[in-house]
Amino acid sequence: MVLYNLILHKKYAKVGTKTSKGEQKMRKGVKVTVLLFSAVLLLGLAACGKKNVQNPQTTAAGSENTAETPAVLKQQIKVAALKGPTAIGMVQLMENAKEQTAKNDYEFQIAATADEFSADLIKGNVALAALPCNAAATLYNKSNGKIRILGINTLGVLSILDTGDSVQTVADLKGKTIYTTGKGTTPEYTLRYLLSSAGLNPDSDVTIEFKSEAAEVAAVMANAGTEEVIAMLPQPYAATVLMQQPDTRIALDVTEEWEKLNGSDSTVVTGVLVVNTEFYKNNRQAVDDFLAEYKSSVQYVNSNVDGAAQLVEDFDIFKAAVAKKAIPKCNITLITGQEMQDKVEKYLKVLCDANPNAVGGQMPDDGFYVK
């Protein structure tokens, strides 16, 4: 309107003069023109103003989209296992950890004997471990409950091999030398129990020759020549011997012999999963995640033997060809809860009755079991 008044004043304002009809018409035309011009000018200014105003919601959303999502921190957990079936069951989990796709950040230690990590397990430097069932009971008793059992991961894996044909029953072992491993652990106590149940004195009727590792026993059989050699070996060492020496046979399946004596509701429990008690109290979700991933790994191993065998070789546990033969006979599993407790208690009771030292002097109490 200021612009309109200036134009009118400049063109038509003359003091003391009258306005003609023509001039009045001209003024009306100019007035309309100026009004239209002003309207266009105001609309343009408004549009410019809108272009410079940002929607605060849009800006905030944009800021959120550009912000980095914080990385999820995985818990570092050290896991130990023995070089054998107890490690074979977790090879897919080991591969997932290597590829950084596991739920936790796992570090694995594969050992020849449980002695290599038992002290660290009690201290908590090793959080989880797979080891012989009776060794777990012994550690629990001697450490005043500093470890607990989570589940059974391996059932019977022992076989008595014979390069000849003289052994058909346990009683036929009388007067023989038996090569084996695991002095003071499951193999020794299982063998002694079978011998005693057959009426043989393990200390006088047979000679039990212990070697530090199963590979040494396999070497004795490989170098036997024409001499008959008898040995008790776990898988996959038994499979190795059978592959290298076609004339060697499985004379006795230790699990079958055990069940003949105790019924099918009692079986050999070779390996178990245990956890440091303090770690379990403070990290239950991490332990649950481990068990879920371990179960998945066991299912993979049992249903994809070729792929699992290759992973066994990749992690320097055994050659793939040996693992392929052994896995179907390894009884790899994961049994938890009440079923786990029932099987472990029955197995340990047999060992404890035969020799209390086999389980650390006494049966472990109910606190041993995570249910």
Language-model regions, residue ranges each:
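Conserved C-terminal helix/tail region of periplasmic/extracytoplasmic solute-binding proteins
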Residues: 345-371
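Pocket-lining segment of extracytoplasmic ligand-binding domains
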Residues: 134-135, 143, 215-311
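C-terminal motif of bacterial Sec signal peptides marking the signal peptidase cleavage site
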Residues: 44-47
